[in-house]
Design a protein with these regions (language model features):
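Positively charged, small/polar-rich N-terminal and surface patches that mediate targeting and assembly
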Residues: 1-124
Length: 124
């Protein structure tokens, strides 16, 4: 089942307020799908103060949105640019993009593998 390393897995971690514009930016460059997660993280911005029922508390993590995209190797530069164009505010906490190699992708319904499994089809 090895697809030859031509498929990448891109993790895009952004502010929750940027998830919808990132989804739109990916659609505009013909990225057919993504898996979305609500996540929490910390980095240079070490948390924030919140209030709950009148009490103030400090949390050491920040809410983030994460999109996971399996794509062709050639799509990665366009994905990175599209995300940076819409998610960059110039402030700490804008997020990160992680790019990994996938050893394979299998479409459960058809058994297609590799790039064939991630290519959007009209009937999928």
């Amino acid at each position: 089942y090895f697809c030859g390393g031509f498929v990448k897995l891109v993790y895009i971690v952004v502010r929750p307020s940027k998830v919808e514009v990132v989804k739109s930016a990916l659609a505009a460059i013909n990225i057919g799908g993504a898996t979305l997660f609500d996540v929490r993280g910390f980095g240079a911005s070490r948390g924030h103060t919140s209030s709950y029922r009148g009490s103030q508390y400090v949390t050491d993590t920040n809410p983030k949105g994460m999109l996971m995209v399996a794509c062709k190797d050639d799509d990665v530069p366009n994905i990175i640019q599209a995300v940076r164009d819409v998610a960059n505010t110039g402030s700490i906490g804008d997020g990160k993009i992680f790019v990994n190699e996938l050893s394979d992708v299998i479409r459960i319904r058809t058994g297609e593998t590799g790039e064939d499994a991630i290519m959007e089809k009209n009937n999928d």
